[in-house]
Amino acid sequence: MVELNPVTITNDNATPRGHVLKLILVESRDIIRAVKTRLCPQYTISYLAQAATVIAMLDTYSSKSELSKPDFFVALTVVNGRRYLREDLESNYLAGYVTGAPIKIEKLRSLLVSLDDSKDIIVSALEKAAKDAKRRLDMWIYDQSQLATGFRIHSFKGAMSSENPELFKKTAVPYLSSYGINEV
């Protein structure tokens, strides 16, 4: 088992909390191999990380009984689009290289697990959430027009928040970022 020592990062301006996990090459390979063996070769460590983030967030959610079957979770994740753009587009679409993609995880009630649950129950929830993440992320990755759209959405939100910072004051979203080098 890989032992991770997260480092908490805070910023006095917005006080976000972040955890940076630095894995050595062997640890990354072990995780990637496990993901590809358990789910299928097309899955990456980012899908598992997105699933684990949502499940961990649900574990801290105080109103679990209020979740209904159709409830879902949406968050943005970073997409490294460089490897998906055609060579003739690379010089013209720099803004679309690194952009955000909304990930939608459905049926949250089915993902409510606890550390006291059996390993099979926890793994099943991770698999289900990872499949949701992959389905949504693939939609953005394989449609090149979506990469540029994501960038425009972030530019719009940035412009709005600079004009009216109070607009997003009470908004909080888990944010997962992976450059993609660990997925090749």
Curated annotation (Swiss-Prot):
A GO molecular function held by the record: acetyltransferase activity
InterPro entries: Tri3/Sat12/Sat16/Mac1
Amino acids binding substrate: H154
Pathway assignment: Mycotoxin biosynthesis
Record's keyword terms, sorted: Acyltransferase, Transferase
GO BP, one annotated term: mycotoxin biosynthetic process
Listed EC numbers: 2.3.1.-
Other noteworthy facts: Trichothecenes are sesquiterpenoid toxins that act by inhibiting protein biosynthesis.
Family: Belongs to the trichothecene O-acetyltransferase family.
Annotated function: Trichothecene 15-O-acetyltransferase; part of the satratoxin SC2 cluster involved in the biosynthesis of satratoxins, trichothecene mycotoxins that are associated with human food poisonings. Satratoxins are suggested to be made by products of multiple gene clusters (SC1, SC2 and SC3) that encode 21 proteins in all, including polyketide synthases, acetyltransferases, and other enzymes expected to modify the trichothecene skeleton. SC1 encodes 10 proteins, SAT1 to SAT10.
Descriptive protein name: Trichothecene 15-O-acetyltransferase SAT16
Species assigned in the record: Stachybotrys chartarum (strain CBS 109288 / IBT 7711)
Name of the encoding gene: SAT16
